[in-house]
């Protein structure tokens, strides 16, 4: 009788959860695109995804910042689809929805637990904005079955603050991009003219939730916000503006990860300045500016491509 009662309660919870999820996805405004399409009816908005969860990869990932991957690896789940259309995207097939496998929320919960069993330092949700209701459901299920490692929300920064509030209490670490301080570049390269404003609002909400960065004895982040910025060739001015804005607004409340891993994966016909890597001079110019600002909490990269990089704490560069 006790087992039946538990099962009945779980079924009730699942029904209520599914009703709430359907209500959100039936008029989708999870991200700033505010498409208002009915994804429960199989329709898709800007992200290209309907209600069914689709993932491209789930595995231990060793290429994040040291406090995220460490030596154990981050339990990364790469979700298919994206609310940005960056012309330089290195994961284009995943972003436009051509790659991946449809799974249930229950299977997603199992994947979280399997990654924990592999000794993942955390669960790393990569580009999951358009699946937040389903992710929350999967996390609820996984936590009931023993999930207890930190959860990382890894995103492009183009977020709706009201949607982020749904993640309060579920996400321990936020890992957003802050790509552009200049809206002109946001329009050109990612088709999102309001990116600077939305990304700043998003980081504010993330910091509100996580508070000051916290680390365990092994150096893994337990709680906090790391903001990433990828330097683009020919656009160091934008990078300087980003660093100044982030440091002035948040100071030591966040870590800033300055990345030089931009790699042209296909030839740009319209934006030819993107057909090369960032030069050493460009990268050092941005790093020097970071030190001029007094940024200490952060990381920079050694290496010149997305695959050949390692992270170093900013203080080690002095």
Please report, for each region that a protein language model flagged, where it lies by residue:
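Conserved small/polar residues in nucleotide/adenosyl-binding loops
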Residues: 312-318
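Short glycine-enriched, charge-decorated loop/helix-capping segments at active-site entrances
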Residues: 93-99, 188-193, 270-277
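Conserved Radical SAM active-site core
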Residues: 47-173, 182-183
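Conserved strand-turn element in the central/C-terminal portion of the radical SAM core barrel
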Residues: 190-192, 203-238, 242, 260-261, ...
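Generic structural signal for well-ordered alpha-helices
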Residues: 112, 136-139, 164, 203, ...
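Active-site beta-loop-alpha junctions enriched in small/polar residues
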Residues: 128-130, 156-158, 230-232, 259-263, ...
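Non-cysteine beta-strand/loop elements that form the S-adenosyl-L-methionine
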Residues: 171-182, 255-261
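Flexible, acidic/Gly-rich N-terminal and inter-domain linker regions that tether
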Residues: 1-74, 84
């Amino acid at each position: 009788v006790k087992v039946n009662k538990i099962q009945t309660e779980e079924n009730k919870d699942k029904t209520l959860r599914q009703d709430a999820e359907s209500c959100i996805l039936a008029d989708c405004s999870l991200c700033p695109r505010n498409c208002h399409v009915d994804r429960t009816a199989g329709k898709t908005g800007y992200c290209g995804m309907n209600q069914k969860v689709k993932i491209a990869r789930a595995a231990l990932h060793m290429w994040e910042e040291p406090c995220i991957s460490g030596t154990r690896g981050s339990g990364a789940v790469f979700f298919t689809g994206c609310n940005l259309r960056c012309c330089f995207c290195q994961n284009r097939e995943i972003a436009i929805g051509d790659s991946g496998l449809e799974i249930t929320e229950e299977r997603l919960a199992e994947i979280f637990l399997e990654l924990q069993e592999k000794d993942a330092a955390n669960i790393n949700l990569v580009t999951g904005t358009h699946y937040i209701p389903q992710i929350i459901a999967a996390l609820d299920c996984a936590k009931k079955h023993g999930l207890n490692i930190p959860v990382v929300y890894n995103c492009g920064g183009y977020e709706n603050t009201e949607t982020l509030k749904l993640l309060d209490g579920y996400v321990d670490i936020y890992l957003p991009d802050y790509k552009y301080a200049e809206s002109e570049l946001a329009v050109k390269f990612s088709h999102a003219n309001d990116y600077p404003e939305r990304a700043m609002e998003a980081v504010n909400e993330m910091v509100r939730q996580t508070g000051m960065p916290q680390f365990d004895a092994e150096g893994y982040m337990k709680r906090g916000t790391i903001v990433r910025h990828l330097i683009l060739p020919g656009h160091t001015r934008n990078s300087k503006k980003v660093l100044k804005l982030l440091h002035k607004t948040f100071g030591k409340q966040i870590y800033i990860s300055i990345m030089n891993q931009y790699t042209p994966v296909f030839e740009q016909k319209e934006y030819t300045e993107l057909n090369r890597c960032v030069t050493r001079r460009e990268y050092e110019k941005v790093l020097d500016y970071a030190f001029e600002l007094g940024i200490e909490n952060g990381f920079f990269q050694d290496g010149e491509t997305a695959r050949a990089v390692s992270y170093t704490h900013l203080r080690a560069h002095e």
